[in-house]
Amino acid sequence: MKVTEVKTFLVHAVRQNWLFVKVTTDTGLTGWGEASVEAQENAVAACIDTLAKRSVIGQDPLNISKIWRQMYHQGFWRGGFIHMSAISGIDQALWDIAGKHYNVPVYMLLGGNVRDKLKCYTHAQTGKEAYHLCHELGFSGVKCCYRYGRLEAALKEIREAIGFDKELYVDQHGQLPAAKSADQMKAAAKYGVAFFEEPVGPENF
């Protein structure tokens, strides 16, 4: 089995355009992946096209780790969210093909089932909205994002609305310097925040 085509599909949406990847093989099996990056979808699509030509087409799609390494190490410069998003989209599609080839869900190829149910959370910016989502619609928790200086007041309002039997999360989208993010996390701790997503940008070590 060999990869014969890698094609991207750009789906226009309101807030963010979605970029999907379709990998086709000579046996007719196809796999799908998703590689959306807000406002950078055309750059990711171009990167996918380059990766496909250099490292994917003609390869056995079941050699997923080999293809991943070739995509990652193909040039002198590597990394960055454009490159890694492109790799991710293709990688997902290859795993999709593998699952279809072996006739098992992909999670079985990754080690099997860990749990038989999942929590489901959504986004809220006010206490009233959070209460409705958690206690009337049944979500297990809510995630919020506030600029520096406003987060603690928002967390207090939301925690009082949903109580401590529901989970609370924060996402800063990597927009703050490390020192300010540290302040935010200290302020969030008293409200039982379960996780603090992207406190700094991916390039900040």
Predicted segment positions?
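Metal-dependent enolase-superfamily TIM-barrel catalytic cores that perform enediolate-based chemistry
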Residues: 111-205
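Generic structural "secondary-structure junction" signal
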Residues: 5, 11-13, 58, 92, ...
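Conserved active-site and cofactor/substrate-binding residues in soluble primary-metabolism enzymes
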Residues: 16, 43, 47, 59-62, ...
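Alpha-helical scaffold segments in soluble metabolic enzymes
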Residues: 50, 89, 96-97, 108, ...
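Metal- or metallocofactor-binding catalytic centers and their adjacent structured scaffolds
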Residues: 26-101
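Structured beta-strand/loop patches that form or line metal/cofactor-binding pockets in enzymes
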Residues: 1-32, 36-37
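Glycine-rich, aromatic-flanked loop segments that form ligand/cofactor-binding clefts
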Residues: 91-123
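Conserved, mostly hydrophobic/aromatic
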Residues: 3, 28, 52, 90, ...
